[in-house]
Curated annotation (Swiss-Prot):
It comes from Brucella anthropi (strain ATCC 49188 / DSM 6882 / CCUG 24695 / JCM 21032 / LMG 3331 / NBRC 15819 / NCTC 12168 / Alc 37) (Ochrobactrum anthropi). Belongs to the IlvD/Edd family. PROSITE patterns: ILVD_EDD_1, ILVD_EDD_2. SUPFAM superfamilies: IlvD/EDD N-terminal domain-like, LeuD/IlvD-like. One of its GO terms (cellular component) is cytosol. Keywords: 2Fe-2S, Amino-acid biosynthesis, Branched-chain amino acid biosynthesis, Iron, Iron-sulfur, Lyase, Magnesium, Metal-binding. This is Dihydroxy-acid dehydratase. Its EC number is 4.2.1.9. It comes from the Bacteria. Homodimer. It is an enzyme of class 4 (lyase). InterPro entries: Dihydro-acid_dehy_C (IPR042096), DihydroxyA_deHydtase (IPR004404), DiOHA_6PGluconate_deHydtase_CS (IPR020558), ILV_EDD_C (IPR056740), ILV_EDD_N (IPR000581), IlvD/EDD_N (IPR037237). The lineage of its organism: Bacteria, Pseudomonadati, Pseudomonadota, Alphaproteobacteria, Hyphomicrobiales. [2Fe-2S] cluster binds at C122, C195.
Amino acid sequence: MPPYRSRTTTHGRNMAGARGLWRATGMKDEDFGKPIIAVVNSFTQFVPGHVHLKDLGQLVAREIESAGGVAKEFNTIAVDDGIAMGHDGMLYSLPSRELIADSVEYMVNAHCADAMVCISNCDKITPGMLMAALRLNIPVVFVSGGPMEAGKVVWDDQVKKLDLVDAMVAAADDSYTDDQVKAIERSACPTCGSCSGMFTANSMNCLTEALGLSLPGNGSTLATHADRKRLFVEAGHLVVDLARRYYEQDDESVLPRSIASFPAFENAMTLDIAMGGSTNTVLHLLAAAQEAEIDFTMADIDRLSRRVPVLCKVAPANNTVHMEDVHRAGGIMGILGQLDKAGLINTDLPTVHSETVAKALDHWDVTRTNSDMVHKFYSAAPGGVPTQVAFSQERRFDSVDTDREKGVIRSKEHAFSQDGGLAVLYGNLAEDGCIVKTAGVDDSILKFSGPARIFESQDTAVLGILNGKIKAGDIVLIRYEGPRGGPGMQEMLYPTSYLKSKGLGKACALITDGRFSGGSSGLSIGHVSPEAAEGGTIGLVREGDIIDIDIPNRKIHLAVDDATLAERRAEQEETGWKPAETRKRKISTALKAYASMATSAAKGAVRKLPD
């Protein structure tokens, strides 16, 4: 049996000094034989998705100690992508994922912790902690802060649901008055929690359920609802049990790499495609798979995207449906249940809470259980009161949504689309692939051709859109915004939002080697690989070149002959792969360090040391 890692610092005469320091943290004689559990929190007052987490780490710690463990809490950083959006702050978002993963590794290995509870929530925090968990491969349970309630505003005697994207779009739309914009701003983000649509944060928290590393309801139970407290309480007890099973019973099945196996990654990606999750999840799953030493690639994502239908459409793909509605329909277990019935997932896999996914679905899928407890759990509703306090309300819907024909979650037979919510496109413009969230693309533009309007940065693209330089039929091409070229691979939420505000959301395309917020929709194609800074073809496109996009056939093609491209490449090699215009962008030493090691989006934008 493997020894408890913590014995390195708690046992033996020569560890008297370390024990003295442990005692100074509150440990007593009887604690030195117990598992030491790291409570990895991410509380910060900068981020609404994390503002309510301050006391939740200690809630988990108390439960760990009541279960017979020793709990020690520390915090990671957390960047709010929405606040960092639209300026150079976004350069730091993706690189922060690597810092979070490293900081968890540093703390856990430096202090020889035996297991972890990861309290995450927003965009890069869950992926960073997931990467760390798979890197360390010690028992872990994920429990996130939960989604925000959808905003609501009453106009013309009708209730309109809102989220962050509505505020961005309205601000750039001249048809809205200043008072209307202010009303949307005040109502769009009413509570603590991760933004209310199927954006990156909620997508990733849902995927931890599919990977088997979190409890049912983790991705969909509202941050404000009292039901969410149970997840934190159970996580504290569960992690102690997992630690004992591994260290005292030599049960390796409880380890993250045993649970988040290759077929579990397939399940997670299948879920993501079925619910039209954020394209950022592709980056993060690829990165996490590398930490787990699993050969899960863009080719696997492409394969899955061709056979998985869209079973759930949530904002931004459907602005009337938010995470609170997904929860009412049975949450992630409800979607997985329909994928299981369609034969699209592997249910023989273990989870942290159940022997197999199949057994978990038998208990937690609202369409196959008669459990009053489960139906009550998924009836949790928004409170409708602005608050930054977790578990502050207990409101419930009168019933859960089990309609799989016209409800929020559909069966395969009644899918929103038989073609999946994410697609990988290949062609001479993206030889290693690029990603589009098809769930957010109108059917009328699944095939699209148009002239490229070239921008060497997100900033100039925003100005071009707002100043009326983009017309219907154009393709906005933003380059040198990849992991190296940005550096940091900025999200393009403002350009996509401004296209919508100008009435061009269904009349234009946007292509970039950067990435998109989970809040983006429309014909938005990102992660073009290789990126321009790596010598990718996207760096050779010239103003007015025609680009052909064919989502049904998974193709993207620059209509320029090979000989001309070869000439352009030779010219570019002489001048270097850099923007054609000088950018007013200060790149710090920290960002330069990331850029020097960053791989392409096709590899998850992880760092790779030079050979």
